[in-house]
Amino acid sequence: FPKDSTPYEGLLAPQLQEDIDNGASAGDCTDPDRFSDEDLLQREAAMGRSNFMLQFQLDTTLSDAEKFPLKMADLIVTSVNPTKAPDNVIWCSDPRNVLKDLPTVGLPGDYFYSPMQLQGEWTEYDETICSVDPSGRGTDETAAAYISQKNGFLYLHEMRAYRDGYSDNTLLDILKGCKKYNVTTLVIETNFGDGIVSELFKKHIQQTKQQILIDEVRANVRKEDRIIDSLEPILNQHRLIVDRGVIEWDYSSNKDSAPESRLLYMLFYQMSRMCRQKGAVK
């Protein structure tokens, strides 16, 4: 049952409206024989809040807050250790946790928060990868993200970006970062280049004598949907921890560009304005 009947403007089925009038609680399942309450909670966690509202509550009138589902406030921002992490990281939107010293380029009222508490023993990460988005046909930017995982939490150590396609200098610099963070797997998007980038990486991996597996992925879903479907469930559950240095690096990038174009290249500016509309990503 809907938490707010206003968006439906009298379009609810009479049976549903009657159930609501008789005391059905918001969020309860309308067909318990098909979906249990626990099943719906699991689906909302897996799909993300905005997609769940669209698919399971048929709400097409998303507010601005729901239209842009990737919020900086859902991140946990702290100094990320290169090799170890605690068992659990607690998020809380208490005003005392707002990081007022970090620059924000998100929507009004959207701030970064530090963790409420770090719990448990500090041990090594379960896995560390480097995700590489190569430039398209060698004409635009290449980006690399260094990410570790432990107990279902993702830790973003560092972002790197390059404007010289996939030159030797770029690939070698990415591999230097792999050595710094003990990366075991390179995840490479192969939409452009037809595997050329992977072959170039293999050559440099052999030369640098690093033990890194290469995992090629090919995206066949529109970029905006792919980004939101991947990130929203993680952000809703507050399981992405970002190093402070990533935010500072992002804000200070492209200093020589005009202010309006600088913003368009910023990671967190793009993230906060990401929606399912085509062209949301420039």
Where does each model-flagged region fall?
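RNase H-like, metal-dependent nuclease domains and their acidic two-metal-ion catalytic environment used
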Residues: 32-215, 250-282
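Short alpha-helix plus adjacent loop in nuclease-associated cores
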Residues: 213-257
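An acidic- and aromatic-residue-enriched active-site/binding cleft used to recognize and process polar
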Residues: 1, 191-193, 219
